[in-house]
Design a protein with these regions (language model features):
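Conserved ABC ATPase "signature" region
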Residues: 41, 99-117, 169
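Conserved ABC ATPase signature
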Residues: 122-126, 130
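A short, proline-enriched helix->beta-strand linker immediately N-terminal to the Walker B motif
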Residues: 141-145
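Helical segment within the ABC ATPase nucleotide-binding domain
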Residues: 162-176
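Catalytic Walker B motif of ABC-type/P-loop ATPase nucleotide-binding domains
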Residues: 147-150
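ABC ATPase NBD coupling module
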Residues: 44-66, 84, 92
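The feature captures the beta-strand-to-loop junction immediately N-terminal to the Walker
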Residues: 9-11
C-alpha cells in the first residue's frame, strides 16, 4: 500500500538480498525462479516482472520500482562526476536535455538537503554517508512508486545512519513511495 514501510529480517545468508533481486527481476544465473510470479499492480494495470521482456523490465525499473542494493555506495562510477552520472541516468529514462537533467538533479538534491557541491564531486571525494545518500537520491529521482532498499546503513556510523534513515523518511513523505 502506498506510503507503507515493510522490513524483512533474517540471519546473514538466509536470502534477503536474493529475494529483493528476484522482486526487481534482477536475478542472474545460476539463480533461477522455478515457479511463481512477481506481480505489481499500478492503478488498473498488473504486470508480472518474471514474464517481461528486457525492455519491459528496463521500463519498469527506476520509474515504477527502484532498488538500492546492499553496499550501494560502491555502484557510483569512480571516474565520473556525480552530475554526469545523474545526467546519464535521467536521460536514459526520460527525453530531456543535459541542462534539464542537471537542473532536475540540482533541485532534487537540494530538496533532499544535499549541498550543491555534491554535483561537481567525484564519488571518492564524498564520505561514505554522503555517497549512500547520493545513491538513494539517484534511485529515487524518477519518483518510483515502490522502493526496495537493502541494508542502507551498513558500514556507516550511528550519526550517519540516522541521517540516511531520515532521508528515506523524507523521500517517503515527499513522494508517497
Amino acid at each position: 500500500r502506498e506510503g507503507e514501510v515493510y522490513g524483512i529480517a533474517g540471519e546473514s545468508g538466509c536470502g534477503k538480498s536474493t529475494l529483493l533481486r528476484v522482486l526487481m527481476a534482477a536475478h542472474q544465473p545460476p539463480l533461477t525462479v522455478v515457479e511463481g510470479s512477481v506481480k505489481y499492480v499500478f492503478g488498473n494495470s498488473t504486470v508480472d516482472a518474471l514474464n517481461m521482456s528486457e525492455q519491459e523490465i528496463r521500463d519498469l525499473r527506476w520509474k515504477e520500482v527502484s532498488y538500492v542494493p546492499q553496499g550501494s555506495m560502491h555502484v557510483l562510477n569512480p571516474v565520473r562526476r556525480i552530475r554526469d552520472q545523474f545526467q546519464d541516468f535521467i536521460r536514459s529514462h526520460r527525453q530531456v536535455s543535459k541542462r534539464e537533467a542537471t537542473e532536475m538533479t540540482s533541485k532534487y538534491l537540494t530538496e533532499l538537503g544535499l549541498p550543491d557541491s555534491v554535483m561537481n564531486a567525484y564519488p571518492h571525494q564524498l564520505s561514505g554517508g554522503m555517497r549512500q545518500r547520493v545513491t538513494i537520491a539517484l534511485a529515487t529521482i524518477l519518483w518510483p512508486k515502490l522502493i526496495f532498499v537493502d541494508e542502507p546503513t551498513t558500514a556507516l556510523d550511528v550519526v550517519v545512519q540516522r541521517g540516511v534513515i531520515q532521508l528515506l523518511k523524507d523521500i517517503r513523505e515527499q513522494e508517497g513511495s
